[in-house]
């Protein structure tokens, strides 16, 4: 990575359930960060068009109505919508990592995915990361990512990657991201919460009422940074109370909480709550070198002779055309001679049987 690079965390509220207006707000935020000379800007989980805080809504018919609206306001990659975002990153000369709900690019599908879209400073789409396993009630909203979503991107500022929310608690995924050479990590979340005894008991964090240390985000991100020796830009969604639909009140956790840490888990910017802001920090590659001198997860502190990680599987495709078995030409010649037929005739027979 570069010896010094300025990065930014965009704690800005989406225009809830309005794709076009939220894209417009994203472009204005990208422009502002570009003027501040940031080279990487990270938005919150599902910034476009907002997190589905209605995910557990009853009755199911009302949930279904929300789901259809969510589909209509989700992002297709690529599309004219991503072109608008790409133009903004090109003009601002920065890389953007944008949390979004993505609608499937598979013909005939309306499935949604919890995605981070990465766009380069040249306006080209670097790629995407789809959340591998939606959490709890999220499985009623989003599909699952696959092996193609375990990836990093080599850029002029360094090797960047990102994962979503509770993926930061997936030990093997963290190890995979480190093994892929990630240097700068983009972490996205739906908010900041107080957790009472277990993950199923959450409420929105209120700075004047609660201790932020009850939220697992802070510990997960600082440990991710230390374990992988990466810089982490962590962005949690913020939606003001007065803009949160009443239907979503039971799962209103959108308190913000963006922060930035170095590879030792030390704050470069501490968490900020309940307001829109862009946090900036200068990343110093020497922080990473110092940490790796003490604890290098891919070098002198690794024991690959004892413990190794395997990436398995292939990208999921609905249609797979079976490849025909190819016989070795010398084997065909021997078989033709054995049965007294021409090689060309044997090839035709095998082809008709579908095995040649």
Model-predicted regions and their roles:
Residues 75-97, 159, 168-279, 346-350, ...:
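CN hydrolase (nitrilase-like) catalytic-core segments centered on the catalytic cysteine
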